[in-house]
């Protein structure tokens, strides 16, 4: 099969012919229909993700069609499925408690095992998989493996966002736009922050109530001004110190900060404003992924027409364009996200 392989950090991925993956007894092999290109892939590509090593096939945000099914998988050839990027064991204390995204023995295609920048992907532990809803395009569904589901869990489980609350979002990449779309569906009043004017205009077009250019003045002060004293919930969607502190500082008393952006490599340790946390009685939440059992709560909204995540997709690209898309994350990016939909090109 054709795959794009990381051979050297910060260099073009190698397009190579490699053997098709084998199928585990509790898993499936999928023909990849679409795979999102995510900032988390970029962390691996530049060498800052601690588990991504040369030789890795990236790609953790995908959907596909079953071409081979293990005897214990519960799926059939021809089924079209969505996969969460965390494949939980189902039996450890975290899994038994419902927090399978904290599984002690999680498997991670795209980070540790071969991912979906390829024509086929082996997916073990198929109890984590969910059927692709009829009528949902694969390029849209791919985001349900990471960015959209991560945003959904961050807002509904970690932050417990309520209708009428102010939601601030720092960064309007894929996860930030997902939080915008989902936050609106939950009835929140959304304020977005970025440094790219085109992305701010794009977010306003998707329904943000206000858009703040982080290059122009004190971000937290300006958010407090447009949110009647501060956001109730603030999402940091980049993983860097400046936006983490802006997110904390923009909150009203008893506000909730959610760390969605991934702090790795040189951003793994950050200095944050603990005084603001103490004085305003703030709550800080970490979040990563979503337990697979929560898929119906999100897919129900999508199926009912209450949520449309298609506007996230800015462009469909061939596998050969993955390197260029990863390189684009080195600086401010254009609005929307890229999805690989052609694995022969």
Task: Identify the residue ranges that each predicted region occupies.
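Glycine-rich beta-strand-centered segment in the early N-terminal region that forms part
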Residues: 21-35, 48-93, 133-135
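Residues in the short beta-alpha loop(s) of Rossmann-like NAD(P)-binding domains
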Residues: 9, 196, 263, 290, ...
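Glycine-rich cofactor phosphate-binding loops and adjacent beta1-alpha1 units
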Residues: 159-161, 201, 206-281, 334
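Mid-domain Rossmann-like dinucleotide-binding core that forms the NAD(H)/NADP(H) cofactor-binding site
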Residues: 80, 134-217, 221
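C-terminal substrate-binding/catalytic core of Rossmann-like NAD(P)-dependent dehydrogenases/reductases
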Residues: 220, 224, 228, 265-315, ...
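NAD(P)H dinucleotide-binding glycine-rich loop of Rossmann-like/cofactor-binding domains
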Residues: 89-170
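C-terminal capping/lid region of NAD(P)-dependent oxidoreductase domains
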Residues: 162, 194, 228, 258, ...
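Short glycine-centered segments of the SAM/dcSAM-binding site in methyltransferase folds
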Residues: 80, 166, 255-256, 283
